[in-house]
């Protein structure tokens, strides 16, 4: 029985879920606003918040911690040089989830926009 298990699985195994979250995080960092399902947005939010908090200190350890999750160099560079300093004085709440009215046509899933707070 899975009582009191809080992990959001998104109906994927661990490797597929990790890859999906990494790709969504990179897209959110590059475009600063993405449209996805509500469940994926809610799963992505804590991961991105922790990455931004890590990027606020732009030292070698922070770079290596970001490299564990994010794969492309330009995304890591943007995190350390642009996004980290932008939220230097903010303690948390770097992202916002906006629910979209109506459901997706193909499968009826609820959609949402997740964006970085300016």
Give the residues covered by each predicted segment.
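Structured, basic alpha/beta domains of bacterial-type, RNA-associated proteins
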Residues: 1-12, 19, 23-118
């Amino acid at each position: 029985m899975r009582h009191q298990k809080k992990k959001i699985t998104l109906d994927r195994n661990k490797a597929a879920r990790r890859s999906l979250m990494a790709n969504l995080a990179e897209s959110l960092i590059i475009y600063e606003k993405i449209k996805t399902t509500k469940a994926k947005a809610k799963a992505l939010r804590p991961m991105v918040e922790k990455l931004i908090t890590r990027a606020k200190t732009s030292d070698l350890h922070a770079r290596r911690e970001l490299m564990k999750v994010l794969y492309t160099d330009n995304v890591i560079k943007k995190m350390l040089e642009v996004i980290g300093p932008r939220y230097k004085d903010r303690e948390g709440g770097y992202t916002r989830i906006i629910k979209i009215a109506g459901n997706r046509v193909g499968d009826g899933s609820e959609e949402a926009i997740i964006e970085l707070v300016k």
